[in-house]
Structures are given as C-alpha cells and as structure tokens.
C-alpha cells in the first residue's frame, strides 16, 4: 500500500459506511471489519459521517446530525477500541467533533475553505483534506500549508516530512472528466506526496456525480481495481466505504464494497506493496 521509501510507520486503512444510518448498522459493519482492524500491519480507522451536507437533492438522507452522530461514533470507539474519522462541513463543528474523532476530514468541495481548514487544524486531530474534483493536485500544497502554518507558524513550505510530523494528510478521490464522471490521474499521487502523505479513496474515485436522478451513482466493479494501481504508484493508505448491504445503503451504495471484498482488496494491496 506504500512503497519502501514511505516514512509512515504502517499503511493506513480508513473504512466504514458513508453515513451513519443507525447504531445497529454501525455495529454490524464494525464487527465485520474486525479482521482488518486487528491486522498488525495496518493502522486502522473506522469512518462514518454524522451529516452528508452536500447531497445532490434536498430529499436525500443526510444522517443523524452532529450530537447524535458523535454519540454513536463514541459508542463504537468504546465498544471496539477503534480510532475514528469523521468529516466536518462547518467551522463550529471542528472542536466538538475532535472530542470523539482522531481524524477530522475536510470534504473535497471545501478543500480551499480557509476558515474551516484553520479551525480543524487548531484541534489535536489529524487533518485529512480531500482533493477537490476541480483541483490541480499541485495546488493542494496551499491547502496543506494553511493547515501546517496553523499548527506551526514557522513552517514556510510544505514537505512530506513536515506534514507527516504535524498530522496533515491529503486524500485523492478523482478529478472531473466532463459532466457526471470522474477519472483518476495516477500522476497526482506522486505530485501530492511531495508535500504530504496521501490516502487513496477507492470508492468515491469511481463515483458518477449526479448520475442517478438527484443522487450520485457509480460502478462497484471499479473500486477493487484502481487501488491496486495506486498501491503500485505509492500511497500511504486506503480510504474505502463499506456496507453489509450496499444496494440498500442510504448514501453512495453504488460505490461501496462489502467487508469481505474490502478484505480481499487490502490483502492484494499489501502484496503489491512488497514488490517495491
């Protein structure tokens, strides 16, 4: 999952459902992810969103909200011992979410929002900034620098080492390719790893924005393929959304992997890592 010259101690795995549907649903997924969470070769984080604030349609399910969502994530943390990732969409959410989450994620659409990046960077959580579908990967260095300078004002330019030390990561999730489609330019992984650790988002990278009459669609045959290519290029970790029953998931089901599919994928990626 990372090449031999990578300085992160272990490959990172971030996995869980797109959005919190219920505590029972979180538990069922968390149980299925235990083999991966217990893999000593991986640095595992359980992920779920308390609010999907950028759904295409007003009618789409968003989640339980900040307070109830964080309570459920804290329950998973307590019961399973998992570290937690969740995303924040507004500045006021950062300090509250950081009481539960070990990683706070900046959504791709908000990757240039200075106030949000600064507020998240003022917490003790790792900052995971998703590259916007509209962004030149090289320009993500400026988002990284916003976070780094918030944490250490003496930093003048971002490097992989300073970003790793200060807990600032980037996440590749594809680039717009005309309307309603995304592609992954594998060159972006190398470009962004010049100034930050890079996580590859296996499931959102195959999304088709707005492709399902008010909802995003995707092709679940591709999430097992692109991460293998990313592992060969060199990455620091994998982000993948997973669900027991993807077809009936309340958000992004078309892109999700079942837990057993994710386990097979990670096994293959670790094998690829050993080739380099």
Swiss-Prot record:
It catalyses: D-arabinose 5-phosphate + phosphoenolpyruvate + H2O = 3-deoxy-alpha-D-manno-2-octulosonate-8-phosphate + phosphate. One of its GO terms (molecular function) is 3-deoxy-8-phosphooctulonate synthase activity. Its EC number is 2.5.1.55. It is found in: Cytoplasm. Pathway: Carbohydrate biosynthesis; 3-deoxy-D-manno-octulosonate biosynthesis; 3-deoxy-D-manno-octulosonate from D-ribulose 5-phosphate: step 2/3; Bacterial outer membrane biogenesis; lipopolysaccharide biosynthesis. GO terms for cellular component: cytoplasm. GO terms for biological process: keto-3-deoxy-D-manno-octulosonic acid biosynthetic process. InterPro entries: Aldolase_TIM (IPR013785), DAHP1/KDSA (IPR006218), KDO8P_synthase (IPR006269). Keywords: Cytoplasm, Lipopolysaccharide biosynthesis, Transferase. Its main location: cytoplasm. It is an enzyme of class 2 (transferase). Belongs to the KdsA family. NCBIfam families: KDO8P_synth, PRK05198.1. This is 2-dehydro-3-deoxyphosphooctonate aldolase.
């Amino acid at each position: 999952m990372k090449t031999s010259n990578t300085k992160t101690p272990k490959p990172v795995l971030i996995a869980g459902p797109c959005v919190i549907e219920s505590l029972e649903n979180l538990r069922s997924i968390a149980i299925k992810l235990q083999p991966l969470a217990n893999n000593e070769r991986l640095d595992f984080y359980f992920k779920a969103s308390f609010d999907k604030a950028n759904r295409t349609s007003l009618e789409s399910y968003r989640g339980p909200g900040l307070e109830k969502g964080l309570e459920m994530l804290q329950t998973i943390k307590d019961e399973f011992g998992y570290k937690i990732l969740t995303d924040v969409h507004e500045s006021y959410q950062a300090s509250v979410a950081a009481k539960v989450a070990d990683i706070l994620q900046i959504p791709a659409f908000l990757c240039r929002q200075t106030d949000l990046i600064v507020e998240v960077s003022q917490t003790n959580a790792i900052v995971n900034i998703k590259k916007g579908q509209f962004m030149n990967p090289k320009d993500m260095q400026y988002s990284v620098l916003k976070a780094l300078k918030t944490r250490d004002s003496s930093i003048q330019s971002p490097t992989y080492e300073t970003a790793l030390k200060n807990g600032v990561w980037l996440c590749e999730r594809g680039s717009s390719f005309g309307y309603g489609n995304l592609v992954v330019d594998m060159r972006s992984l190398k470009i962004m790893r010049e100034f930050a650790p890079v996580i590859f988002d296996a499931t959102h990278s195959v999304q088709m924005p707005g492709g399902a009459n008010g909802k995003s669609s995707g092709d679940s045959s591709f999430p097992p393929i692109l991460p293998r290519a990313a592992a060969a290029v060199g990455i620091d970790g994998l982000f993948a959304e997973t669900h027991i029953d993807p077809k009936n998931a309340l958000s992004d089901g078309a892109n999700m992997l079942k837990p057993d599919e994710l386990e097979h994928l990670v096994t293959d990626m670790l094998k690829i890592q050993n080739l380099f």
